[in-house]
Amino acid sequence: MTEENNNTAATVTDQTEHSNIITIQTTLGDEDEDIHKCGKCLAEFSALDAFIQHKLSRSCKRTQDPQTNVVPNEGVSVEVRSSENECSSDETATANGEKQDAKVASGDKKRSRSTSEDESSSPSKVVWKLNTEGRYVCDICAKTFKTTNILRTHMFTHSDQKNFVCEMCETAFRTKGSLIRHKRRHTDERPYRCNQCGLAFRESGALTRHLKSLTPCTEKIRYSQCKEILVSKDGIRKEVQPSSPEPEKEQIPVVRVVEAGQEIIQIEVVEEVQQVASQPQTATVVEADNLICQAIINSGIALETEATEAAGQVEAQSPKAVLGAPETETRITEIQVTEECVETLAEETQDSSVKEVEPVQSKLYKCPHCERMFKTLNYLRVHVKGHVGYKPFKCLTCQKEFLTGYVLKKHMETHVSERRYKCGECGKQFKAIGHVREHMRAHSDERPYHCSFCDKSYKTKNALQVHHRTHADDKPYVCQHCSRGFREKSALVRHIRHHTGEKPFKCSKCGRGFAEHGTLNRHLRAKGGCFAQLKDCEHVVNSEEQEVTTESVSTTIVSDDPHAVLVEFSSVVADTQEYIIGAPAEEAAQGEEVAIIQDNQQQMDSHIMKVVQQIVSQSHGGHQIIVRNVTADETPGISDSGDTITIATPESLTEQVAMTLANAISDGTILTTTTEDTDETSHTTVTMVTAENVETIEQEEQYVIASPEEVEIQTVVVV
């Protein structure tokens, strides 16, 4: 069907009655000239001018005419089928013994039977399908493409062959386009730039997602970074011409080409990006045979470097020419950190300051500092920079520094006041989607993070890290006002509010302010409700003429009645004087603020609950609330500690008061009541179980409930 004539390919069209099949068969030959083929009409041109004129003309259309001559790749027989006549074409192709179909799928070639005796001598054949729109259809995934070249490239994605290998990290890819996109990660080339904010991206898809994001790109943070990239010595064969600098800076840009002893050329590039880019940056183009070197120079990075005083020494040591280097000595203001590209790990470097990277097993790279393993050398380089404190990306809002631009981008979400992400379980809103995923673990019963020192387990990794500090007694967060240390930064923030008096959380019912959001929630969930106008009690004798100053140390309520109540208020508790049970005027003049509650049990219980709720809501972090009962023949001891609130209740109310306090701190309930017998008396300790992050600690046969707000409750029933 196909005849070979010297070094040219002849095409014969085989038409059947049932289908239109174009079968093109070519043989190998010596190609003396370059052939330019049109992707639409598949026409070939030997002259470049004729090919360009053909592309500019509008007469070029994709044809489905079976008479059109198509010249495929060398040694490949191509059969183009129409999707409408696919069934009839298959029958014709099977009947013809000289045709041989090849179908590419996952790297395997399925060949039909051939009547030819010498199967190896006949060229292979690839079947392309055309749909009604004139697009080529993939047999495996049914995707359509404009040209056969694009379809042929697409077929490599269904194969296991990875013939395109990165020269820097030896990662293999199926297509050349994937390799080019991968190399941009090494060179940091970002050719796709947003016209609104000036932010650049490595891939066009990333730019498209950026333009379609929920938040419009009105203001984007630009980063100031300093980089040094090392490439092989053979990669640079031309002199490097830097871009012209800005005239107002009075600096001469220099790209220093340094010849090292390890056959490595060092290129120092300093990138300085302004807040608002008024003019587009001019990229410096360098003719270089090496693709990596050309990508580095043509990546759009502004080569705005300052000359160093060592430029003269570099010029003397290296035979390479340095263009634009000044003769005068200047100083560099940026700290240069060298990033080395180690191609052969077995070779030992002469510099003793650089530690040797040890490859482990199947291309795993181990960090010499912390024994962590990485799949690629590039990840290891970024990780090692964190050990040496190299953090070139700086937040302009809080001045924090980060190792990579991606981490800085995630950090910038914390400065956004809008909370766009909402938890579907509890309705809590967050600024970042990652915070929602971390929060969702609180609604599950899984505790995957176990402590290696004890048997405790936690739902989040951060909670486990905070718990580890309890074993090491590590409190890295120190208050600048009182030098008190905390294990969590959030605890320090809440503590500082007590110094500053800040109460950002307001109650919508009574208008009271709270320093913490959790305290406001507990205030709203209190059993007695929100008492905004509670000034006195209906069933308590209260003197309206009595004035109590903020310097009063305590107020004591004593009675011989076994149901009497003793309440000791600390002087550091704010606004508690209005809830002190008043005494007669003549007793107050003697300095003894004592009142006796002589009423029925129900009225006294109601009053105690109100007082307890007010005490807990107005007490701040660092207080210790002790609940104990008082008998008729017992004289209660009054603590002189300024951080203690003692509430002595009758035996019948101790358990109820303890439960109220537990609810005030966190949704706690009384679980068990255990009795511990001693020589003379028996003590009953009320054990409470509270919500998460509130620990129950046993201290001297008593239970202390410790909450994140640094408030401790000690409940003891004395029988």
Curated annotation (Swiss-Prot):
Q: What is its main location?
A: nucleus
EC top class, as a word: transferase
Keywords carried by this UniProt record: Cell cycle, Cell division, Cytoplasm, DNA-binding, Growth regulation, Metal-binding, Mitosis, Nucleus, Repeat, Repressor, Transcription, Transcription regulation, Transferase, Ubl conjugation pathway, Zinc, Zinc-finger
> Its domain of life?
Eukaryota
GO biological process entries: cell division; negative regulation of transcription by RNA polymerase II; protein ubiquitination; regulation of cytokine production; regulation of immune system process
Where do Basic and acidic residues bias regions lie? 98-109
Give the record's GO CC terms: cytoplasm; nucleoplasm
Chain residue ranges for the region called Mediates dimerization and DNA-binding? 128-207
Residue ranges annotated as zinc fingers (C2H2-type) are: 136-158, 164-186, 192-216, 365-387, 393-415, 421-443, 449-471, 477-499, 505-527
Catalysed reaction per UniProt? Answer: S-ubiquitinyl-[E2 ubiquitin-conjugating enzyme]-L-cysteine + [acceptor protein]-L-lysine = [E2 ubiquitin-conjugating enzyme]-L-cysteine + N(6)-ubiquitinyl-[acceptor protein]-L-lysine
Q: Which Gene3D superfamilies match?
A: Classic Zinc Finger
What biological function has been recorded for the protein in this entry? May function as a transcriptional repressor. May also function as a ubiquitin ligase. Functions in cell survival and proliferation through control of the cell cycle.
The name this protein goes by in its record: Transcription factor E4F1
